[in-house]
């Protein structure tokens, strides 16, 4: 696989070519994903739940994300690697710059930040300092205590309108990718069409430019339960490499996510 950059993702959006993304936390799986030509890998704070066994992502630290980013980069030199900014690691622009710098030095190509238009100034400051940003909207797991649990976002008209506004504001501030989690498919399609930057979805229907899954869900090895928006590709194929290839094919062909993986 050739080295992937944000320019490739922009080109694919313009061409209408969908792309697959998956979380990765270590060199071995990162290497497997690169060999199967997964273009984008996310070192997610989901590691707090799937690796550390916590009930949410809040305890994860910047140092832990940096460690796993180094591991993923070692295994996958050519993928575009996004690294999550953990809870409270970007409470101020100064904190954001310091912690984003650690993740970029660990091998990330981009950092991911959760939040709406209130993080626009932070996004702008990072972009001005050569740190590409993916802005995460919808169900933002770091806000689980505000939401009262892991709930679908953007179902009422006012919240849907605010999410569209958030996406456009963050794009204008310099965000180079928008990630939508657990939002109605119709809203995700609207945001995807409104934004000029690539939009990645998880539990957001199949109209987004890209899809992302937590690797443990894709392989059916999550400790607790399988989210509605996920699919066990390993059960279907019986082989990890074939499972990754099937996931990529289904995303590119627009057959995943199907109706049963989608919220309305």
From Swiss-Prot:
Record-annotated active site: 181 (proton acceptor)
Its EC number(s): 2.1.2.11
Gene Ontology molecular-function annotations: 3-methyl-2-oxobutanoate hydroxymethyltransferase activity; magnesium ion binding
Gene Ontology CC entries for this record: cytoplasm
Residue sites binding Mg(2+) per the record: 45, 84, 114
InterPro entries, sorted: Pantoate_hydroxy_MeTrfase, Pyrv/PenolPyrv_kinase-like_dom, Pyrv_kinase-like_dom_sf
Pathway assigned in UniProt: Cofactor biosynthesis; (R)-pantothenate biosynthesis; (R)-pantoate from 3-methyl-2-oxobutanoate: step 1/2
Binding site for 3-methyl-2-oxobutanoate: 45-46, 84, 112
Organism superkingdom: Bacteria
Primary location recorded for the protein, binned into one broad class: cytoplasm
Cofactor note: Binds 1 Mg(2+) ion per subunit.
Name of a matching Pfam family: Pantoate_transf
Keyword terms of this UniProt record: Cytoplasm, Magnesium, Metal-binding, Pantothenate biosynthesis, Transferase
Enzyme class, first EC level, given as a word: transferase
GO biological process: pantothenate biosynthetic process
Cofactor: Mg(2+)
Reaction catalyzed: 3-methyl-2-oxobutanoate + (6R)-5,10-methylene-5,6,7,8-tetrahydrofolate + H2O = 2-dehydropantoate + (6S)-5,6,7,8-tetrahydrofolate
Compartments where located: Cytoplasm
Subunit (UniProt): Homodecamer; pentamer of dimers.
Function: Catalyzes the reversible reaction in which hydroxymethyl group from 5,10-methylenetetrahydrofolate is transferred onto alpha-ketoisovalerate to form ketopantoate.
Family listed: Belongs to the PanB family.
HAMAP family xref list: PanB
Name of this chain's protein: 3-methyl-2-oxobutanoate hydroxymethyltransferase
Gene name of the record: panB
